[in-house]
């Protein structure tokens, strides 16, 4: 590659991935505390689900053959000999001409091969006279007999043992994120503990003489720290464990000391915003080089062209312990939108790979969109434009007959500067403008990266 050629997004990302030795080690977590964690092992169901035949409805457990002649105007009568409630094992067998009242979810008693819903029955007294209205709620006094007004097929209104899962079925694969649904499934088969990847420990450092922390006086030339809190939130949303390294002045010794603190604390990655360009106060690259190898890349992306990446070790770590891979170092631009975009492009997928996510879960979901506005970017650099999409009254994106959403510039044409945070806050996606275009007109089709979806 020639010195003046910009790296493509893919080239830069592959260089980052090449430095990742593998995911973090596993640890045991309570399932109840596992939301968002990533499974580190192949997990199978220890039991069938359901674990036994059970009723899908309130009604009566019966022999289907006993109802073969039943009709609405010519019901058949069955003797009620007992009741089974949810959580109660049956202690009576269904015999020919009998029925057992059963609750939804209760085990099917022996001898029964179907359930007749209560809505298709009428309670009777011992003489066969109606003892209540048809379809009466199945929680009152147990009737002596019932009239069944419809024939029932074998297996009717039953959930068969293992119909959801057979014992030994894989339920969680390595790299699966524990969502509420996955946690519910694992709990439903009796699991309480799960092996998950440890969340990557990530140090976050903001830089700049003008940057002020929480509660500090801004004075005549200070600005509140936006990048630090934003990066902390982005790290956590990506599955990492964020650890603030504070705010460093534009001085080599301050930046160096804070990076060293992150390395000594055992961070798997350190992210620094600001100070990675080539100005006289851009000292991050030199501070990085005190601890490892670092390169300043010029990436063909807008916003966010300057980007530093490398690896480092804490003082005293000679690399002899294979269980302690080097720390990843990321130097991001200081402008808030550039920080956000470069994090999305390079840091987020790296952290998710460190955290053990499936390869197909490293990136944001991709869609197709039609631009509602003209867009101008820099030719030769891939543009990532902040947009919001048309939605219906339920908040669902509207789609045309080709399945495409309509994307509007967040903040309008003036809201696309790398310093404009207000437009970023209202965007729910990034529209991708190919390198070969510097202008796309309204109606052009583009790739869309959703930001409000994992």
Where are these regions (language model features)?
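Short, low-complexity, intrinsically disordered N-terminal peptides in bacterial proteins
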Residues: 1-7, 18, 127-139, 315-324, ...
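Short, glycine/charged-enriched hinge/interface segments at domain edges or termini
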Residues: 2-4, 9-10, 43, 61-249, ...
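Short, low-complexity N-terminal leaders and the immediately following helix N-cap/first helix
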Residues: 1-72, 78, 101, 139, ...
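Conserved active-site and cofactor/substrate-binding residues in soluble primary-metabolism enzymes
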Residues: 4-11, 26-29, 33, 47, ...
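Flexible glycine/proline-rich
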Residues: 27-32, 41, 54, 87, ...
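Helix-rich terminal scaffold detector
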Residues: 1-10, 192-332, 336-342
């Amino acid at each position: 590659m020639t010195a003046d050629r910009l790296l493509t997004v893919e080239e830069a990302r592959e260089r980052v991935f090449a430095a990742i030795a593998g995911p973090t080690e596993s640890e045991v977590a309570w399932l109840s505390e596992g939301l968002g964690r990533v499974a580190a092992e192949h997990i199978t169901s220890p039991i069938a689900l359901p674990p036994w035949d059970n009723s899908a409805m309130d009604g009566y457990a019966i022999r289907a053959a006993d109802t073969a002649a039943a009709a609405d105007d010519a019901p058949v009568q069955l003797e009620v000999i007992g009741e089974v409630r949810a959580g109660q094992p049956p202690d009576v067998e269904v015999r020919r001409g009998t029925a057992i009242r059963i609750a939804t979810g209760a085990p099917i008693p022996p001898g029964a091969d179907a359930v007749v819903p209560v809505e298709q029955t009428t309670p009777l007294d011992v003489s066969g006279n109606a003892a209540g209205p048809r379809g009466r709620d199945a929680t009152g006094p147990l009737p002596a007999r019932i009239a069944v007004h419809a024939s029932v097929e074998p297996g009717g209104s039953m959930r068969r043992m293992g119909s959801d899962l057979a014992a030994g079925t894989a339920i969680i694969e390595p790299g699966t994120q524990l969502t509420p649904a996955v946690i519910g499934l694992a709990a439903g088969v009796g699991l309480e503990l799960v092996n998950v990847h440890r969340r990557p420990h990530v140090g976050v450092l903001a830089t700049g003489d003008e940057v002020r922390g929480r509660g500090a006086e801004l004075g005549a030339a200070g600005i509140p720290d936006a990048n630090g809190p934003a990066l902390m939130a982005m790290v956590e949303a990506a599955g990492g464990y964020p650890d603030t390294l504070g705010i460093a002045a534009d001085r080599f010794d301050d930046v160096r000391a804070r990076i060293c603190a992150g390395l000594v604390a055992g961070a798997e990655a350190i992210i620094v915003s600001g100070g990675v360009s080539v100005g006289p106060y851009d000292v991050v690259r030199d501070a990085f080089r005190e601890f490892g190898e670092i390169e300043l890349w010029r990436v063909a992306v807008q916003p966010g062209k300057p980007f530093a990446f490398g690896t480092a070790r804490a003082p005293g770590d000679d690399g002899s312990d294979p269980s302690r891979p080097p720390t990843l170092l990321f130097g991001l631009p200081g402008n808030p939108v550039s920080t956000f975009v470069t994090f999305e492009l390079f840091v987020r997928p790296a952290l998710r790979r460190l955290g053990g996510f499936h390869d197909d879960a490293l990136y944001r979901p991709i869609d197709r969109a039609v631009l509602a506005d003209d867009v101008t970017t820099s030719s030769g650099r891939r543009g990532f434009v902040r947009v919001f999409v048309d939605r219906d009254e339920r908040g669902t994106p509207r789609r045309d007959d080709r399945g495409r959403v309509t994307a509007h510039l967040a903040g309008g044409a003036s809201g696309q500067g790398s310093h404009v945070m207000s437009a970023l806050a209202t965007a729910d996606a990034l529209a991708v403008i190919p390198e070969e275009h510097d202008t796309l007109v309204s109606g052009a089709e583009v790739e869309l990266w959703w930001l409000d979806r994992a």
